[in-house]
Amino acid sequence: MNTSEELWLCLYFPLLPVEVFCRHDNSPVVVLNRQRVSFLNQPARDIGIMQGSSMSTAYTISDHVVSFERDENKELKRLEHLAQWTYQFTPSVSLTPPQSLLLEIGGCLKLFQGLTNLKQTIGDQLTALGYTVAM
């Protein structure tokens, strides 16, 4: 691949609305929008809570559910923080709110010994920081 060609990698954070409140928590966590579950972590799914459920339904399933009201400002600030973090991989980063970043990686593939290694490095580091990411 010619390193002068643009190549964009999208980092999608499907659980960012949950992870802005807690990233390393094994408790069932839900994020509400108008008293409905909009986002939930895997422990919440595992006990049977579903997206779209009312908060009262979630509490009926388990009184150990931790709930937060969605905070889009907090999500944007975290996305901006993550964008700053990705500058270690490329100088070209674009925010695509509400839950994604675009990284221009065409010029840095050689440095990271290819796309597979770059994706693995980014994924491993984000996982260690407590984020769920899809690329």
List each language-model region with its residue ranges.
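Residues that scaffold, gate, or flank divalent-cation-dependent active/transport sites
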Residues: 1-102, 107-109, 113-124, 128, ...
